[in-house]
Amino acid sequence: MATRSVLLALVVLNLLFYVPPGRSGPNVYIQKIFASCWRLQGTCRPKCLKNEQYRILCDTIHLCCVNPKYLPILTGK
């Protein structure tokens, strides 16, 4: 009887730790917040689109790509 209980406990623990491959990870909204920059107006990407500019780096490989209408006006020389 004890063997059956241990086996049942192992099966239940195995099912609890199983993560389906298609739905694992944070949801889309959380990913968007953590992959954004420039006051949530920009997106961290390896390469910016044609209509975007970058001013800062998100990390060592990603650029903060921002639409020029959200960038401040540069003054000076």
UniProtKB/Swiss-Prot annotation:
Q: Which family does it belong to?
A: Belongs to the beta-defensin family.
Q: Does the keyword Disulfide bond apply?
A: yes
Q: One biological-process term from Gene Ontology?
A: defense response to Gram-negative bacterium
Return the InterPro entries for the record: Beta-defensin, Beta_defensin_dom
Could you list this entry's UniProt keywords, alphabetically sorted.
Antibiotic, Antimicrobial, Defensin, Disulfide bond, Secreted, Signal
* Residues spanning the signal sequence: 1-24
Q: What is its main location?
A: secreted
One GO cellular-component annotation of the UniProt record comes to:
extracellular region
The cellular location(s) given in this protein's UniProt record come to: Secreted
Summarizing the function annotation, the protein's role is: Has antibacterial activity.
**Know the name of this protein?**
Beta-defensin 135
